[in-house]
Design a protein with these regions (language model features):
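An intracellular "coupling" helix at the cytosolic face of ABC transporter transmembrane type-1 domains
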Residues: 10-17, 107-108, 124-140, 185-202, ...
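Cytosolic ends of transmembrane helices, especially the final helix of ABC transmembrane type-1 domains
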Residues: 196, 219, 243, 291-318
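ABC-type nucleotide-binding domain
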Residues: 334-573
Length: 573
């Protein structure tokens, strides 16, 4: 348990003053709760003396005491708001830290955690009651306040009547037994609930991402059935948690009421026998009533802690996942004059898939087509060249420098990458092209024109808004925005992963014509399944079953390589 509190307390360090302020409000709140019954105890026991003629000073002091207690209660009223503020701040910082750590991960991480699961961990696990944000401040400080009230109230009650205090606390051992019996079962149910939530998010994410396929195959009923089964399972788990919590709270309330009835009955006898005063009985009853909330709050801390700790484990699981290997290269490129593969290869962990044995040297300016059947390692090869995947064997050199020795930031400056799926964001076309690089409008417009998507053809120019995933424009326009993003930085190395697949023949031809007309020294690697695209290239890298089969011009390979001809005939359009 201590490891969780150490993890939480590190967020307190950035809010020391606010934490001290909360501690002060906690003390004020507990003190006010303690003082109020004592003032009325005094009033009940001394009402005749206070109201008697000539006792104006005593009456004035009593009014001042009541005023002070009232003012203190007003100050203590800021307590929930102060807790809520720190809840929000901690939630924001935890999410920011987790998101920053996620951005440092590599392919191993994203093959293990799906988008829906990650979204759940960064939202529900952090901000939903009673998860990390609420528990880190409100949960802990409420427990501290309740513990303070418990200690203070019990102290005063023992001072007034130790015997009556002992009798009123008879239900306490039963409460502890209930907590012990339910604590482990509740923790197990909470973990099951979090996993069910992540599974639901994953299903929704994959459904919305592939909605076109689902509609095309009329698979709506199948997806609805999967969701219904997941929700039924999740509902059963959540109901079991709710039942456990209801049983705990109900039993605690009943036992608390038993204690109050005991005080009224036995306390009345004590008053009749002059063992305590009527003011003592009033104060005693109020203190016991005040104890009921702490006696629920403190066990509730353990209940909510199970849920919060499960969420902390889930957030820490993604934060503590090993990051991508540190690339400590510092060498600069400036431009890209050549790329050389030296028996380069990459194998995905736990399987033989990937690409191996790639050897060849390519000099700028040149267009290189990467060709092969589905699953031959084409996309893997360009991801290796972009630095997304490390070479597990051999090496890749840029300008004669091993890729691992190149400054990663410098490599990104000279590289333009277009993935198979045009990943666009819910923002304007201009911001999608800039991608935080602070480019002038003229630079963005030039890149769009080069991708054959002039800004003037868009409804609102650069400010044209795109929906989720680039919705609102055609598939060809989305791909051209992605190409413009890659070209906007004037890269010397362009990596196009089947990016012309969504373009018709005329659009693709205009793209290549525009790149040639612009001139400049560019080394372009383009993964393609189109023979028309291959014809635009100077050289072809032909991969077959994950191994380099041949390198040559399209005409040479057609003439000399039977496997190439077969793949061209069966896999390419």
């Amino acid at each position: 348990m201590l490891k969780y509190f150490r993890w939480i307390f590190r967020y307190y360090r950035t809010h020391r003053l606010h934490t001290v302020f909360l501690a002060l409000l906690t003390l004020i709140s507990a003190t006010v709760a303690l003082a109020f019954p004592l003032v009325f105890r005094y009033l009940l026991d001394n009402v005749q003396e206070v109201l008697a003629p000539g006792s104006e000073d005593r009456f004035l002091k009593l009014l001042l005491a009541l005023g002070a207690v009232g003012f203190a209660r007003m100050v203590a009223g800021f307590y929930p708001g102060a807790r809520a503020w720190l809840n929000s701040k901690i939630g924001m910082e935890v999410r920011d830290d987790a998101f920053g750590e996620i951005l440092k991960k590599d392919y191993r991480f994203f093959s293990k955690f799906g988008p829906g699961d990650l979204s759940t961990r960064l939202t529900d696990d952090i901000v939903e009651y009673p998860r990390i944000a609420w528990f880190s401040c409100s949960g802990i400080f409420r427990a501290v306040e309740s513990a303070s009230r418990l200690v203070f109230c019990l102290g005063v009650m023992v001072f007034m009547s130790a015997e009556l205090t002992l009798l009123s606390l008879v239900p306490l051992p039963i409460m502890l037994w209930i907590f012990y019996r339910t604590e482990r079962k509740l923790g197990k149910r909470v973990e099951e609930s979090r996993k069910a939530t992540s599974s639901t998010s994953d299903l929704l994410d994959s459904t919305f991402a592939g909605i076109a396929i689902i509609k095309a195959y009329r698979a709506e009923k199948g997806q609805s059935g999967r969701l219904r089964r997941l929700l039924d399972s999740r509902l059963a788990i959540d109901l079991s948690i709710t039942k456990l919590v209801m049983v705990i709270e109900s039993l605690y309330s009943i036992l608390g009421e038993v204690g109050k009835v005991t005080v009224l009955f036995l306390g009345g006898l004590f008053v009749i026998r002059d063992r305590i005063s009527i003011g003592d009985l009033y104060a005693f009853y109020v203190y016991l009533d005040m104890l009921l909330a702490p006696m629920i709050d403190i066990p509730n801390l353990f209940v909510t802690s199970k849920q919060a700790f499960a969420s902390i484990d889930r957030v820490r699981e993604v934060m503590d996942f090993p990051p991508a290997p540190e690339r400590s290269g510092v060498r600069k490129l400036g431009s890209v004059d050549s790329v050389e593969f030296r028996n380069a290869g990459f194998r995905y962990p736990g399987c033989d898939a990937g690409v191996i044995g790639v050897t060849g040297r390519f000099e700028s300016p040149m267009t290189v087509a990467v060709v092969g059947e589905v699953g031959s390692g084409k996309s893997t090869l360009v991801k290796m060249l972009s630095g997304q995947l490390p070479c597990t064997e051999g090496d890749i050199l840029v300008n004669g420098i091993p890729l691992m020795e190149v400054d990663p930031s410098d490599l990104s400056l000279v590289t333009g990458y277009v993935p198979q799926e045009s990943s666009l964001f819910s923002d304007s076309v201009g911001e999608n092209v800039r991608l935080g690089r602070g480019m002038e409008d003229q630079t963005v417009e030039r890149a769009l024109a080069l991708a054959d998507l002039p800004a003037g053809d868009l409804p609102e120019g650069l400010e044209t808004k795109l929906g989720q995933g680039g919705s609102g424009v055609s598939g060809g326009q989305k791909q051209r925005v992605a190409i413009a993003r890659a070209l906007a930085g004037d890269p010397g190395l362009c990596l196009f992963d089947d990016c012309t697949a969504a373009l018709d023949a005329d659009l693709e031809q205009r793209l290549w014509d525009g790149l040639r007309a612009e001139g400049g020294r560019r080394l372009i690697f383009v993964v393609t399944h189109r023979e028309a695209t291959v014809r635009q290239s100077d050289l072809v890298i032909f991969l077959h079953r994950g191994i380099l089969n041949a390198i040559g011009t399209h005409e040479e390979l057609l003439r000399t390589n039977e496997v190439y001809r077969l793949v061209l005939a069966t896999e390419m359009s």
